[in-house]
Amino acid sequence: MSLRFIYGRAGSGKSQYCLNSIKNRIEEDIDRPLILLVPEQFSFQAEKNLIEVLDEKTGFKTQVLSFKRMAYRVFNEVGGITAKHMNESGKSMLLYNIIEDNKNNLKVFKKAAKRQGFITTISDIITEFKRYNITPEIILNNLENIEGDNLKYKMEDLALIFSQFETRLHKNYIDNEDDLTILVEKLNKSKQFDNAEIWIDEFSSFSPQEYSVLEKLLLKSYRINITLCTDYLNQGRFVDTTDVFSPIKNTENKLLQIIEDNNIKLDKPIALKCDPCARFKNSAELQHLEKNMFSFPYKEYKNETKDICMLKTLNQFTEIENTAKDIIKLCIDKGCRFKDIAVITGDLEGYENIISSVFLQYNIPFFIDKKREINNNPIIVLILSALEVLSKNWTYESVFRYLKTGLLDINNEEMDILENYVLANGIKGYQWTNDKPWEHKSFSNYELEDQALKELLAKINDIRYKAMEPIVTLNKNFKSIDKAKEFCEVLYEFLCNINLPDKIQNMIEDFKVEGEIEKASEYNQIWNIVMEVLDQIVEVIGEEKISLKEFFKILQTGFSEYEIGLIPPTLDQVMVGSITRLRSHNINTLYIVGVNDGIFPSPLKEEGILSDDDREFLGDKGLEIAKDTKSIAFEEQFLVYSTLTTPSKYLRLSYPIADGEGKTLRPSIIISRIKKIFANICEENDIVKLNGEEEELKNISSAKPTFNYLISNLRKDVEGVKIDNIWGDTYKWYLENEFWIEKLNRLIKGFDYTNQSKYIETKKIRNLYGKPLKISVSRVEKFSQCPFAYFVQYGLKAKDRKIFNLSYPDLGIFMHSILEKFSHELEKKGLEWDTMDLNWAEEEIDKLINEELDNKSLDILNSSKRYEYVTKSVKKILKRSIWLIGEHIKRGNFKPSYYELSFDIDGDYPPIAMELHSGEVINLIGRVDRVDLLQKDGATYLKIIDYKSGIKEFKLSDVYYGLQLQLLIYLDAILTELAERSGINGEPGALLYLKLDDPIVKNTVDMSDEEIEKSIIKNLKMKGLILNDPNVIRDMDNIISGISDIIPVMVKKDGGVSEGRSSVATKEEFETLRKYVRYTIIEICEEMLEGNIEIKPYKKKDGSSCDYCIYSSVCKFDTNIRGNKYNILIDKKDEEVWDAIKKKLEYKNI
């Protein structure tokens, strides 16, 4: 019985020494068991290395074991395990059930138990207790020593959960974490390790469980040799926590304590020298890094480096692209093999997708060494979403998550049809399962004949029944059961009924044919995982009564703990992984990417359930558990040391200055440390672009990425930018390659691409728009905003997918409708706005809105509590609006005369006819919300009012550009009709926008009701254009003094109008505007009928017509594309507008 330490720094050859020692023992033919004990993740590599040192005939004489493998060997020899092992998934499901049963008994964790991830946290701490040989009884026996209620209650909760977990677990199962505890007991009976010589390699520390196993092995074996990655120790047992080797020295001290307690001999240690280290014999730079990275003071390396390089990049994508180029260069120039290269990072999740994308493009074979979560696998999504449909009562999200897994007998076209219908009509809950066919007609944006509509509805109902039938059956079967075991049986029947096993098998075969071996391997494991989870539920809680929601949660918990490990499909490939999972020292070349602050070294971990203070206190009381975050942070430097000393030939560290979102990233402290040690380190960056053939050559590597660089340079050449001659040679290579020539020619043609199609044939446009042209004034304005958007909306009739919600336009239409009905009700009853009873008016508004809701004309307002609130708000707004209208009318002499005055064939007035220069007549249709009239001095003055639910300003500049034409053309049409029909001398009075709102008045505590009303009136002041006539103005606001609070006018003390502070126009100016608007509409309509569909949105200083356009995905407008330019509209002052309008009319002789 003896222990021997093998000391050596990283790369000194400790592992090789072990292998050589084993070989020597075999050659000496000593009859003694030979064991190589390594961590589980190193076992495959250790076996491979051992075979390389020995041969096939002698290799079998040595066993390569991990602690887990050792346990299984002993159990097979002497017995010990009669129950099955429960995996992490089963543990989590059991813990979920225990916590649910005991949630009311928990003192600290009652609320936390509901949080996502809590089960995993509890599972982790139970694992920690077991590895540190702590039982529920030990926790309970130490409770009296714990001061402070918070920690005491925590430990009581943990003891309760842990105790019940142990009791219920051991009925049918055993925990994987119990294996080493049982191994310690069974080693006494085992003969396998009697007089054995054991070599222990690649460990930096051990858990208390493992120390107990080692103690037993020391008592049974001839000798244990253990490698320690450190200097030769001769300074006693004192450990400086800041020393890079402090974790190793702690390990040595614990082993020394064990042999001291058991009177075991300590053999003379082996100290491997490192001048140079075996690993770095061909690289003085890597040798220097190993010696000085954590030496204080360090020795500076003066020469320029070639084996250690740094790369500073613009972002993570360019970082990986540069890494790929360097790998290709190494393989071509230096004959490096992919299998000798590793790319590692402290943020594998953030880099994984980028690495996959770039390496595939560069044809670099790679394997990402990580376990895959299964929660996003379609099979798991199908199972969980099917249960979610039932537990959440057929919500849209759960139903279509289930349907979109691709594992059901519904194709994509059927799915789209069904989804469009469901979204348009807000289908949810019982609407899915009742027997009545769906008959809503509000689901298509396109007008269909009755027969076509019936056929489409029939098809939708067929798809609906096909989609819901399996889940309806599942729900029916669930309703008659209440035990966990029965839920599992019913779910299994459901999966078989939808032929899931056969579908999975077909998918696996398809993946294999397509060469997607990793996908095939993943799907091959998933079905077995599902069965394993169901089996464990049956065996652990099978007889317990649970609800459907609990079953869903238990399954969700079980699946969340599973991770799939995949085997590398080939040997010659780049290994990509996390820094913490770096498994092999047989790496020549190592790329560490993302060497940024907070990534490598990794930041401090969260303290978890037990804080650092808790752990320190428990340790002082004799309850030793895992290290606190501070100790782990000190150990992180040993991980840094181990990582940096892994490669034998070449090391490159790279760091981006920004992440994918453009947020600044700082370089790690490792970067600055290495720069100090290596004053002339090889350092590159891709931030400052250098010119020259040598730099351009770096972009020529694999065919696909080089092709992308070639296209980029050819575009520069087309744009007149000088490019390097090397791209001419590259172009010739692709031209002579059959595989690339077609792609090359196609992309070169793309240099002339434009998304513009400025005009289409007049005949075609007539067919689209109709003849004669009948068009609303708002559509004319739409054309002015962007001809292409108009063409798509009214020519192609493309519309947004209908969604069951209430948009602002919908709300505006609804409020207009109620106001119209209210206005007609006033007329019918012979009431006036300025004298009506407000209580009656408010009751009438309530009645009209309730009638609309009862008639289901706006179903959505009855569909949820949220929309009930919206309805209340609408009622408040309309009540405020009728009060406001009444106040306006009280203040003047204009009287409401027309409501919803329409211009159409069957309207109040005929369509507004306009003759184009070709002689063709177009008909404008539209509707005016309200027209007030004033009889004065033999003339009839018109005040046209447009109700708006949002903010609307009147701008002469917008009139000039054709963006604001409606009120003026209506004014012109009414004045014309009055003159021609009745011989009435009509005059313009005002064009106004009235906002429908119920504004909040702030600081009302000290305000009287009258002051509040004044504030509201002022807040809702109308915008528009008023006739510049003081008398007419007073007929709109008879109490005006200074600035009016209802119309956009200010009068001076002498009674005149302050034109600079008012929005006014003279009678002559109104006449000018009437002419200009007619001329503008004719010009716009002629452009329209000539086939102008140019993508030319307007742009002003406050925005563009693209801001809220729903057709941006159709036009692909981009100022970088040739021919794509905004129609820049400069906001003109009113004086400038008047001048411009007059000049244009004079030029056109109008």
Curated annotation (Swiss-Prot):
It comes from the Bacteria. This is ATP-dependent helicase/deoxyribonuclease subunit B. Belongs to the helicase family. AddB/RexB type 1 subfamily. Its EC number is 3.1.-.-. GO terms for biological process: double-strand break repair via homologous recombination. Its cofactor is Mg(2+); [4Fe-4S] cluster. Despite having conserved helicase domains, this subunit does not have helicase activity. One of its GO terms (molecular function) is ATP binding. PANTHER family: RECBCD ENZYME SUBUNIT RECC. Gene3D superfamilies: 3.90.320.10, 6.10.140.1030, P-loop containing nucleotide triphosphate hydrolases. The lineage of its organism: Bacteria, Bacillati, Bacillota, Clostridia, Eubacteriales. It is an enzyme of class 3 (hydrolase). Heterodimer of AddA and AddB. Keywords: 4Fe-4S, ATP-binding, DNA damage, DNA repair, DNA-binding, Exonuclease, Helicase, Hydrolase, Iron, Iron-sulfur, Metal-binding, Nuclease, Nucleotide-binding. [4Fe-4S] cluster binds at C786, C1106, C1109, C1115. ATP binds at G8, R9, A10, G11, S12, G13, K14, S15.
